[in-house]
Protein backbone atom coordinates (compact mmCIF):
# COMPACT_ATOMS: atom_id res chain seq x y z
CA UNK A 1 0.00 0.00 0.00
CA UNK A 2 1.16 3.50 -0.62
CA UNK A 3 0.58 5.03 2.80
CA UNK A 4 2.00 8.30 1.67
CA UNK A 5 1.77 9.57 -1.85
CA UNK A 6 3.60 12.78 -2.44
CA UNK A 7 2.35 14.84 -5.31
CA UNK A 8 4.37 17.76 -6.50
CA UNK A 9 1.92 20.51 -7.28
CA UNK A 10 2.13 23.99 -8.66
CA UNK A 11 -0.45 26.66 -9.17
CA UNK A 12 -1.52 26.88 -12.77
CA UNK A 13 -0.27 30.47 -12.83
CA UNK A 14 3.33 29.35 -12.42
CA UNK A 15 2.90 26.93 -15.30
CA UNK A 16 1.36 29.72 -17.38
CA UNK A 17 4.29 31.97 -16.54
CA UNK A 18 2.40 34.70 -14.74
CA UNK A 19 3.94 34.11 -11.31
CA UNK A 20 6.86 36.13 -10.00
CA UNK A 21 9.71 35.61 -12.44
CA UNK A 22 12.63 35.88 -10.02
CA UNK A 23 11.79 33.39 -7.28
CA UNK A 24 9.65 30.30 -7.05
CA UNK A 25 8.71 29.09 -3.57
CA UNK A 26 8.80 25.31 -3.09
CA UNK A 27 7.39 24.36 0.31
CA UNK A 28 7.37 20.96 1.98
CA UNK A 29 7.26 19.50 5.46
CA UNK A 30 10.43 17.43 5.57
CA UNK A 31 13.57 18.06 7.61
CA UNK A 32 17.18 17.98 6.37
CA UNK A 33 18.30 14.47 5.46
CA UNK A 34 14.82 13.28 4.51
CA UNK A 35 14.60 12.10 0.87
CA UNK A 36 11.89 14.67 0.15
CA UNK A 37 14.18 17.42 1.46
CA UNK A 38 17.09 16.16 -0.66
CA UNK A 39 14.85 15.94 -3.75
CA UNK A 40 13.53 19.48 -3.26
CA UNK A 41 17.07 20.84 -2.96
CA UNK A 42 18.11 18.97 -6.12
CA UNK A 43 15.03 20.26 -7.95
CA UNK A 44 15.95 23.82 -6.96
CA UNK A 45 19.51 23.35 -8.18
CA UNK A 46 18.48 21.84 -11.52
CA UNK A 47 15.61 24.27 -12.15
CA UNK A 48 17.86 27.26 -11.53
CA UNK A 49 20.51 25.79 -13.83
CA UNK A 50 17.97 24.99 -16.57
CA UNK A 51 16.68 28.57 -16.54
CA UNK A 52 20.18 29.99 -16.65
CA UNK A 53 19.59 31.58 -13.26
CA UNK A 54 16.66 33.61 -14.56
CA UNK A 55 14.46 31.83 -12.03
CA UNK A 56 15.54 30.60 -8.63
CA UNK A 57 13.80 28.27 -6.22
CA UNK A 58 13.47 29.14 -2.55
CA UNK A 59 12.94 25.83 -0.74
CA UNK A 60 10.87 26.35 2.41
CA UNK A 61 11.44 23.07 4.25
CA UNK A 62 10.49 21.66 7.65
CA UNK A 63 6.85 22.82 7.43
CA UNK A 64 7.89 26.47 7.71
CA UNK A 65 4.97 27.35 5.42
CA UNK A 66 2.48 25.22 7.38
CA UNK A 67 1.35 21.62 7.38
CA UNK A 68 0.45 19.74 4.19
CA UNK A 69 -3.14 21.02 4.12
CA UNK A 70 -2.03 24.60 4.71
CA UNK A 71 0.57 24.33 1.95
CA UNK A 72 -2.05 23.13 -0.53
CA UNK A 73 -4.25 26.07 0.42
CA UNK A 74 -1.27 28.39 -0.01
CA UNK A 75 -0.57 26.90 -3.43
CA UNK A 76 -4.14 27.46 -4.59
CA UNK A 77 -3.92 31.06 -3.33
CA UNK A 78 -0.60 31.67 -5.08
CA UNK A 79 1.35 32.22 -1.85
CA UNK A 80 3.66 29.33 -2.71
CA UNK A 81 4.27 27.91 -6.15
CA UNK A 82 5.19 24.28 -5.56
CA UNK A 83 4.63 21.80 -2.75
CA UNK A 84 5.62 18.17 -2.28
CA UNK A 85 2.61 16.96 -0.40
CA UNK A 86 0.93 13.96 1.19
CA UNK A 87 -1.80 11.66 0.01
CA UNK A 88 -3.99 12.56 2.99
CA UNK A 89 -3.92 16.28 2.38
CA UNK A 90 -4.27 15.88 -1.38
CA UNK A 91 -7.36 13.70 -0.89
CA UNK A 92 -9.10 16.75 0.61
CA UNK A 93 -8.89 18.31 -2.85
CA UNK A 94 -9.10 15.17 -4.99
CA UNK A 95 -10.98 12.58 -2.87
CA UNK A 96 -10.03 9.72 -5.20
CA UNK A 97 -6.39 10.13 -4.14
CA UNK A 98 -7.38 8.57 -0.81
CA UNK A 99 -7.96 5.26 -2.59
CA UNK A 100 -4.25 5.04 -3.38
CA UNK A 101 -3.60 4.26 0.28
CA UNK A 102 -5.61 1.05 0.30
CA UNK A 103 -3.66 -2.01 1.42
CA UNK A 104 -2.64 -4.45 -1.32
CA UNK A 105 -3.78 -2.07 -4.07
CA UNK A 106 -0.55 -2.48 -6.07
CA UNK A 107 1.45 -5.67 -6.36
CA UNK A 108 4.71 -3.76 -6.80
CA UNK A 109 6.21 -0.34 -7.56
CA UNK A 110 6.27 -0.79 -11.36
CA UNK A 111 2.52 -1.44 -11.26
CA UNK A 112 1.95 1.63 -9.08
CA UNK A 113 4.00 3.80 -11.43
CA UNK A 114 2.16 2.44 -14.48
CA UNK A 115 -1.15 3.43 -12.88
CA UNK A 116 0.03 6.88 -11.78
CA UNK A 117 1.73 7.59 -15.11
CA UNK A 118 -1.44 6.59 -16.98
CA UNK A 119 -5.14 7.43 -16.96
CA UNK A 120 -5.42 7.52 -13.17
CA UNK A 121 -2.63 10.08 -12.90
CA UNK A 122 -4.24 12.10 -15.69
CA UNK A 123 -7.59 12.03 -13.83
CA UNK A 124 -5.92 13.18 -10.60
CA UNK A 125 -4.25 16.02 -12.49
CA UNK A 126 -7.54 17.06 -14.12
CA UNK A 127 -9.29 17.16 -10.74
CA UNK A 128 -6.39 19.11 -9.23
CA UNK A 129 -6.62 21.57 -12.14
CA UNK A 130 -10.22 22.27 -11.11
CA UNK A 131 -8.82 23.50 -7.77
CA UNK A 132 -6.15 25.64 -9.44
CA UNK A 133 -3.32 23.12 -9.07
CA UNK A 134 -1.16 21.23 -11.55
CA UNK A 135 0.29 17.82 -10.71
CA UNK A 136 3.88 17.73 -11.90
CA UNK A 137 4.61 14.23 -10.66
CA UNK A 138 4.18 11.70 -7.90
CA UNK A 139 6.38 10.75 -4.98
CA UNK A 140 6.33 7.48 -3.11
CA UNK A 141 7.55 6.21 0.22
CA UNK A 142 7.38 2.64 -1.02
CA UNK A 143 4.44 0.30 -1.05
CA UNK A 144 3.34 -0.78 2.38
CA UNK A 145 0.66 -3.19 3.34
CA UNK A 146 -0.69 -4.12 6.75
CA UNK A 147 1.65 -5.03 9.60
CA UNK A 148 0.76 -6.70 12.88
CA UNK A 149 2.65 -7.36 16.11
CA UNK A 150 1.70 -11.04 16.28
CA UNK A 151 1.83 -12.34 12.72
CA UNK A 152 2.73 -11.40 9.19
CA UNK A 153 0.09 -10.15 6.78
CA UNK A 154 1.46 -10.95 3.31
CA UNK A 155 -1.97 -11.29 1.66
CA UNK A 156 -5.46 -9.86 2.21
CA UNK A 157 -6.67 -13.33 3.27
CA UNK A 158 -4.37 -13.12 6.31
CA UNK A 159 -6.57 -10.31 7.67
CA UNK A 160 -9.44 -12.72 8.27
CA UNK A 161 -10.48 -12.60 11.93
CA UNK A 162 -7.77 -10.09 12.82
CA UNK A 163 -8.59 -6.98 14.85
CA UNK A 164 -6.79 -3.89 13.61
CA UNK A 165 -7.00 -0.16 14.21
CA UNK A 166 -6.87 2.36 11.42
CA UNK A 167 -6.59 6.13 11.55
Where are these regions (language model features)?
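Bacterial N-terminal signal peptides that target proteins for export
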Residues: 1-7
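Cleavable N-terminal signal peptides
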Residues: 7-9, 19
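Sec/Tat signal peptide C-region and signal peptidase I cleavage site
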Residues: 14-21
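A local structural motif
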Residues: 23, 45-63, 134, 156-163
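Extracytoplasmic "Venus flytrap"
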Residues: 25-42, 62-67
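Contiguous mixed-secondary-structure segments that line small-molecule binding/active-site clefts
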Residues: 45, 86-167
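Alpha-to-beta junction loops
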Residues: 52-55, 71-85, 163-165
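Short helix-initiation/N-cap motifs at beta->coil->alpha
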Residues: 60-73, 152, 167
Amino acid sequence: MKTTLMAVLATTTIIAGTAQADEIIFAHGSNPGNPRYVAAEKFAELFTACTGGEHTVNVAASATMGDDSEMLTSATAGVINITANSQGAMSQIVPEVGLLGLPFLFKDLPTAWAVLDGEVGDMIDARANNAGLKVLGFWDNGIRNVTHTEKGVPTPADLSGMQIRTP
